[in-house]
Amino acid sequence: IQSTSMDQGSLSEDSMNSLLRTLIKADIWKNKVSKQMAGTKDDIQTTVKKTDAEADAIENKNMRLGFQPVVSVDAELLRQQRRFSSPRVLLSENTPLEPPPLYLMEDPMVLNRTSRRKRFAEGKSHRGEYSVCDSESRWVTDKSSAVDIRGHQVTVLGEIRMGPS
């Protein structure tokens, strides 16, 4: 299962969850049956019932632990499920080229989804840039010239007139 951005359409979350459960159960069933094949019809039916119960138990355990298993999906099963499309998940026969981004799991904003995130403007970021000297929080009244933030000499006005006069 490979994550990507697709513009083909969206499914409800319940539909996608049931598809993923079906894929996981089918893969677990396929692997267990191929290992436990004894030959008789009764043995296969018993194995199917046992495997469904095991798949549910494994799924419940994994949900509690927050673990998402990596599964190999049969190509035929993928061809049958082509009608399912999602903007977040792409079912593919190929393995992903890179591992999932783990840095998202470490980000505190991802872990705490109830907190509000500060918006930022597009473009150049000034993160980590601080002024060299501390600012002063007092009025200066005896200055007639100063240096602005670009390093240019400027005249300080003693009085500012506003409105018509």
UniProtKB/Swiss-Prot annotation:
Record keyword Repressor present: no
InterPro entries the UniProt entry points to: Cystine-knot_cytokine, Nerve_growth_factor-like, Nerve_growth_factor-rel, Neurotrophin-3, NTF3_N
Disulphide bonds in the chain: none
Primary location class: secreted
GO biological process: cell surface receptor protein tyrosine kinase signaling pathway; modulation of chemical synaptic transmission; negative regulation of neuron apoptotic process; nerve development; nerve growth factor signaling pathway; neuron projection morphogenesis
Glycosylation sites: 112
Keyword Signal: yes
Positions annotated as propeptide: 4-119
Protein known as: Neurotrophin-3
Natural source organism: Ramphotyphlops sp. (strain YPM 13663)
Gene encoding the protein: NTF3
